[in-house]
């Protein structure tokens, strides 16, 4: 990318201290997202995907690292400055049932951020809420109803509308369809894709569904135990994965075409505890291609082809 990225993350870390150990949930994570780009973040449960999303918006405080958003270091902003910044950075939560207050009307939920930011008159805020509902294809009378009156898919549309009311530049979509029925997931994914293209949104799309990520994302970041394993364009990553972990993930995607199916690569064991990560490469204990040097060398992200990076000391595997 030649232009200055909208979001630039360098050396992001999030550690939790217990009585007996330090939990390294994220460790030295760095990536960029260009304006108007959709970047997917994939990995197994417990890899740190949600922690990255929440750290970027400072919904949780990072332990270390720099988070540059349009030239401002988010990690160093005061509470007042961060409140102003949040009108440009919004979050779509995974659970559409838990993320909406049962005591508030949908209109009150949609206008809450506008009230906090002091944007517009009451009539102008109401108009923004109505516009957001229209953008997510919900009827106008939605505004006077309560969350329990809607299905899971409708609630997630309301969550998307809430993020849109502040007209943000950047959205973190944290597994926005994983809690929905399969029949509804495609509708919500298509809606997000349409909104992103129509409004020119920049998005970090967190998911464990690799088929959805391929459909909606321009580039993909593969995360394992709090470290980045691979970064590439969606097209290149799915066609020519360079890291053994990425290959294992992609081999698990079901295909209806018998001729297109690949041999399933089963990873041995479970993901290690962040309290006691393996030395060297954190993936080595489950990697089918590991060698002795993997136990002593921490692999750094390196460019193996134009725009394609992997964290692996081995070549041509």
From Swiss-Prot:
GO molecular function: ATP binding; ATP hydrolysis activity
PROSITE patterns given in the database record: ABC_TRANSPORTER_1, ABC_TRANSPORTER_2
Alphabetized InterPro entries for the sequence: AAA+_ATPase, ABC_transp_ATP-bind, ABC_transporter-like_ATP-bd, ABC_transporter-like_CS, Oligopep_ABC_C, P-loop_NTPase
Source organism of this protein record: Brucella abortus (strain 2308)
Cysteines paired by S-S bonds: none
Short name of one Pfam family: oligo_HPY
A single GO BP: peptide transport
Residue numbers binding ATP: 43-50
Record protein name field: Putative peptide import ATP-binding protein BAB2_0818
Enzyme class: translocase
Keyword set includes rRNA-binding: no
Family of this protein: Belongs to the ABC transporter superfamily.
GO cellular component: plasma membrane
Purpose of the protein: Probably part of an ABC transporter complex that could be involved in peptide import. Probably responsible for energy coupling to the transport system.
């Amino acid at each position: 990318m030649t232009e200055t990225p909208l979001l630039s993350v360098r050396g992001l870390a999030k550690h939790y201290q217990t009585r007996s150990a330090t939990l390294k949930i994220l460790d030295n994570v760095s990536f960029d997202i260009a304006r108007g780009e959709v970047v997917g973040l994939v990995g197994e449960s417990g890899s740190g995907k949600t922690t990255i999303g929440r750290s970027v918006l400072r919904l949780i405080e990072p332990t270390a690292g720099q988070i540059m958003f349009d030239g401002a270091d988010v990690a160093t902003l005061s509470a007042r400055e961060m409140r102003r910044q949040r009108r440009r950075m919004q979050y779509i939560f995974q659970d559409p049932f838990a993320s909406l207050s049962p005591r508030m009307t949908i209109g009150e939920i949609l206008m809450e951020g506008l009230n906090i930011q002091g944007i517009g008159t009451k009539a102008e805020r109401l108009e923004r809420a109505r516009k957001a509902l229209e953008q997510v294809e919900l009827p106008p009378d939605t505004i006077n109803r309560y969350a329990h009156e809607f299905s899971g898919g409708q609630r997630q549309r309301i969550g998307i509308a809430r993020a849109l009311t502040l007209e943000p530049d950047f959205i973190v979509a944290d597994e926005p369809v994983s809690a929905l029925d399969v029949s509804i997931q495609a509708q919500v994914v298509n809606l997000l894709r349409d909104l992103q293209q129509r409004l020119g949104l920049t998005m970090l799309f967190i998911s464990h569904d690799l088929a959805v990520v391929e459909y909606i994302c321009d580039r993909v970041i593969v995360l394992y135990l709090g470290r980045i394993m691979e970064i590439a364009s969606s097209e290149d990553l799915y066609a020519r994965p360079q890291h053994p972990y990425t290959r294992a993930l992609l081999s698990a995607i079901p295909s209806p075409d018998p001729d297109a199916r690949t041999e399933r690569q089963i990873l041995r064991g479970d993901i290690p505890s962040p309290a006691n990560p393996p030395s060297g490469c954190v993936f080595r204990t489950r990697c089918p291609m590991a060698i002795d040097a993997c136990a002593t060398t921490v692999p750094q992200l390196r460019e193996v082809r134009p725009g394609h990076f992997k964290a692996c000391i081995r070549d041509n595997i």
